[in-house]
């Protein structure tokens, strides 16, 4: 049974929501930085949002991950756990700053 087919544990759901709240905050900061023409800061926060989004998906599936900022590694893990997300995860590999 693949991770998405398993029941989602309530603790995993709560932790994934916590990660997603941080994703939203990073995207808000990226938008504000873009409006101020601070494109480096914007790119950094978009990368952070992509990283945390992938970690939220792994947490939701109950999949452990090591403390890393490696989007390529996280995308590979997402592709294994959620094969249907593979094209989207692959696109996030290129967001590294």
Where are these regions (language model features)?
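Terminal alpha-helical segments
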Residues: 1-97
């Amino acid at each position: 049974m693949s991770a998405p087919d398993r029941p989602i544990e309530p603790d995993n759901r709560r932790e994934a929501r916590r990660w997603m709240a941080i994703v939203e905050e990073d995207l808000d900061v990226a938008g504000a930085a873009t409006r101020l023409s601070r494109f480096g800061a914007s790119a950094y926060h978009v990368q952070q949002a992509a990283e945390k989004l992938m970690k939220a998906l792994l947490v939701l599936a109950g999949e452990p991950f090591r403390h890393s900022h490696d989007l390529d590694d996280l995308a590979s893990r997402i592709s294994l756990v959620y094969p249907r997300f593979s094209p989207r995860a692959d696109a996030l590999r290129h967001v590294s700053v």
